[in-house]
Amino acid sequence: MEGKNLTSISEFFLLGFSEQLEEQKALFGSFLFMYLVTVAGNLLIILVIITDTQLHTPMYFFLANLSLADACFVSTTVPKMLANIQIQSQAISYSGCLLQLYFFMLFVMLEAFLLAVMAYDRYVAICHPLHYILIMSPGLCVFLVSASWIMNALHSLLHTLLMNSLSFCANHEIPHFFCDIDPLLSLSCTDPFTNELVIFITGGLTGLVCVLCLIISYTNIFSTILKIPSAQGKRKAFSTCGSHLSVVSLFFGTSFCVYFIPPSTRSAQKDTVASVMYTVVTPMLNPFIYSLRNQEIKSSLRKLIWVREIHSP
């Protein structure tokens, strides 16, 4: 292996989905449509929350941050893929690949953290409604969101620096449409034990904390809802967390298929297709889930559209 320390390589090649020109044209159109819908939908949710003072509550503060994370998340991977299809190239620079890895890990973990924080918010709202305003103070909300951003920025930086310390062999082809950590580790010609150990410890710990927060919060939520005597009261209580539960199921369900399925039953093609679900489809569906199942969001959207019609010439 001497003389083959290739950490200074200039680029990787993202194999993506297909090399057939006709299939690439179809993929370009599909992903461009999904990307535009995702960014527009999430930015619209943020705009609605900012402009409607009635939505200036902890729940919608967290939702605005989740929408921002979704818009950034999809912007980390899809634009580069679209650009490569457009210029008929599979190349991504070494620094560009590490930069993509950094932001991908930042936003995927940030999404998990924010969903856990939102579950805690719903727990307090349903299980301790009389103390909700006192517990979910503006200071605590800002702290929870700021801590999520900072912790995940540092967590992503750690993994990116460790990846940069590896040497890569002659094969620079990544069987994926973006620079994910597992495909990159498989290309290393040096022992990635340290990287894998850090992934196991930090990734396992942060993932466990998020999942436990979700499980504990929703266990208490469902327990409280079942104790409500009237059916109308149960429906009203469940409606406050139904949208969030749908998003949680979609995000964690699809990401589970990529990272927790035994390697013996996985393939690069299956992982790539499954990755589309939580990197592209989930961020695209989130605004629709919240707008269709949330009466306050729908009402604010109607008011925003009505105001624009009134002021339009």
From Swiss-Prot:
Record-linked PROSITE patterns: G_PROTEIN_RECEP_F1_1, G_PROTEIN_RECEP_F1_2
Keywords, comma-separated and alphabetical: Cell membrane, Disulfide bond, G-protein coupled receptor, Glycoprotein, Membrane, Olfaction, Receptor, Sensory transduction, Transducer, Transmembrane, Transmembrane helix
Compartment(s) where it occurs, according to its Swiss-Prot or TrEMBL record: Cell membrane
Membrane topology category: Multi-pass membrane protein
Extracellular side: 1-25, 80-100, 159-196, 260-272
Classification via Gene3D superfamilies: Rhodopsin 7-helix transmembrane proteins
BP GO terms, sorted: G protein-coupled receptor signaling pathway; sensory perception of smell
Main location: membrane
Function: Odorant receptor.
Name of the protein in question: Olfactory receptor 1G1
Annotated organism of origin: Gorilla gorilla gorilla (Western lowland gorilla)
